[in-house]
Amino acid sequence: YPSHYFCPIMIKAHIRKAQKSDAASILFLIRELAIFEKEPRAVIVTQAQIEKDGFGDRPLFACFVAVVDNQVVGMALYYPRYSTWKGPTFHLEDLIVTEPMRGKGIGTQLYNVFLEHAYNTGVKRVEWAVLDWNLPAIKFYQKSGATISEDWRSVQMDKKSIDRYILNINS
């Protein structure tokens, strides 16, 4: 699909692979997303951790950033996963555009570059989560051909729960 099919590109961003020097901007975007998702206190990751985990010897994630006027204004952060049914996949952890730049086609540009990368890499699936109240995002994803699964539930265990579980099985 042409990119204007989803959101008109009013501002052309430069989309590139993130670099270690982008870590502060990445953290800023993560914090902004947490506020948007009504979880402002949930972010505990640090800039140093982003630098190590994304740009160290063994990166745990990769990221594309959108740059306008030498400012990082958006990102698509993802990491590889493996499906026992399909093979290699990517998980799109966050697709974020800073609030003043939303609705200008920057998210579409990031989404396009991420999916082109997935296509060129040969992954068998990409997946991500979207909050049920984020209707503009849901519409955007559905228009692009993504399927919103109603029958799978997201399951998580935070650090405290992991610690408690391990204590219980080892006592």
Features from the language model and the residues they span:
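Conserved beta-strand-loop-alpha-helix junction that forms the acyl-donor binding cleft
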Residues: 128-137, 156-160
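Conserved beta-strand in the GNAT
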Residues: 65, 71-79
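Conserved GNAT acetyl-CoA-binding A-motif
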Residues: 119-129
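A short, internal acetyl-CoA/4′-phosphopantetheine-binding micro-motif in the GNAT/acyltransferase core
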Residues: 95-102
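Conserved GNAT-fold acetyl-CoA-binding loop/helix
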Residues: 27-52
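A short helix-loop-beta-strand connector motif used in the catalytic cores of GNAT acetyltransferases and
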Residues: 54-65
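Conserved active-site alpha-helix within GNAT-family acetyltransferase domains
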Residues: 108, 112, 132-150
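A short beta-loop-alpha structural element at the N-terminal edge
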Residues: 14-26
